Amino acid sequence: MSLVAEAFVSQIAAAEPWPENATLYQQLKGEQILLSDNAASLAVQAFLQMCNLPIKVVCRANAEYMSPSGKVPFIHVGNQVVSELGPIVQFVKAKGHSLSDGLEEVQKAEMKAYMELVNNMLLTAELYLQWCDEATVGEITHARYGSPYPWPLNHILAYQKQWEVKRKMKAIGWGKKTLDQVLEDVDQCCQALSQRLGTQPYFFNKQPTELDALVFGHLYTILTTQLTNDELSEKVKNYSNLLAFCRRIEQHYFEDRGKGRLS
């Protein structure tokens, strides 16, 4: 499809109202999805809740392979399929819904910088823990990732994914990091987020933005995911305002809207 045709389709999609049957796809919640993908999915769910846009969550064993980018979550809205938080934020904005339009340009730049920090530090740490920490790989990751598939496909897919992630880690300079170094990076990230949040309810005072959705998705998932030990979640628990922030969003955007406690 040409760029002109794509732009035309996007304009048509933007003109259509948000449907009641909009769907978000992710892997199987109980036995398959891993920490990083669960965090990404929760971030998108929180963002859509903050925009007051209804979404139905559907779990599929092959969600990763259904996604146009190979990453989850992705949403199916009308005849459009969009994956990952950034593109979903832009897609929703094209439909007239934005959480950050009220920010000044300097604030928008700051918001994007903190989102980059979360993706570069927290997301990368989650991937490292899942695929490079031998205890986690052996006890959790391989079994969960390959759980929907028969032998030997379950092992083949898990080792293939592990190879991809390890190659990425080497490319970004994380290949030789120790677990302690990764946990220290997580602590530094949490410290920066805690200082920016301060005593405010959200990162930019009284109204949430996509940054709040992203941070909530990762921190809440870290706090509620059972791993081989509690070292990762303990880093988050050191910051009381981040804990209160997670509880505030869970209560306001999930419990108060009849969705029940996320955990």
Curated annotation (Swiss-Prot):
CDD domains: GST_C_Metaxin2, GST_N_Metaxin2. The gene is MTX2. It comes from Homo sapiens. Involved in transport of proteins into the mitochondrion. Belongs to the metaxin family. It is found in: Mitochondrion outer membrane; Mitochondrion. Coiled coil: none annotated. It is linked to Mandibuloacral dysplasia progeroid syndrome: A form of mandibuloacral dysplasia, a rare progeroid disorder with clinical and genetic heterogeneity, characterized by growth retardation, craniofacial dysmorphic features due to distal bone resorption, musculoskeletal and skin abnormalities associated with lipodystrophy. MDPS is an autosomal recessive disorder. Clinical features include poor growth, osteoporosis, osteopenia, acroosteolysis of distal phalanges, arterial calcification, renal glomerulosclerosis and severe hypertension. The modification N-acetylserine is found at residue 2. This is Metaxin-2. GO terms for biological process: inner mitochondrial membrane organization; mitochondrial transport; mitochondrion organization; protein insertion into mitochondrial outer membrane. It holds the Pfam family GST_C_6. GO terms for cellular component: cytoplasm; MIB complex; mitochondrial outer membrane; mitochondrion; nucleolus; SAM complex.
